[in-house]
Amino acid sequence: HVYPEIDKAILNTYFAENGAPIHLDDIREFIPSVCSIEIPYVDNAIRHLAQQGVIQLKDENVYPLQLKKAEASACVLIKHEKGLPWLDIAKLINGNNYSRSPVYEDRLDHEAFNQPEYIYLSGKGTYKHTCFIDVDAALIDDIFLEMMEYAEKNSRPVFHLNEFYQASRNLKKHDYYVIRHFVKHFGEDYGFYFDGKSQTDSIGLEKGFKNITQKDVIVEAMN
């Protein structure tokens, strides 16, 4: 048998984007599309990955066994359009052995949710796969333009994300946590610096700003 050497992580992104299990035929089609392997050797390559403990073959299905924690979270979340609490995600990953190292179940495992192209915080302690965000790129520009206008009108160096959200009909068409995801990961391109520590969701117009709390906003409005 010829066992072609292929990158052990070759399927990781595929699982993160499509979930598990994946039908063997889809894997057969995918592998030659991302590496220079000759078609007759694809089955050998798949068998070799299974022998190395990278994947598990069951009937005609392929399951991952060596994903990074965040890839494993994405793999689970693709099947849950409404999102899941972090503990449920951890239990599903560990129960299915999708990850090369177990995800903490006694506390939030930040490493398991730190992959913004696939995962976003969708509520208090719950996460969703980004494939369920229904917003196109042009709309993201519009969202930030509105935020810029608001920041110019209210000349302060730091804002609370909720202020922008409540002040804009356009932003309110989208879920708060979707806007939060955009600001957190694309904001710096538009001059907004996000800090989500301690649930404040503060946004500064300069890097390294001091956080504001909801109380600061209310007190300022009273003066």
Segments the model singles out, each with a brief description of its role:
Residues H1-N223:
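C-terminal non-catalytic scaffold/interaction domains in large multidomain proteins
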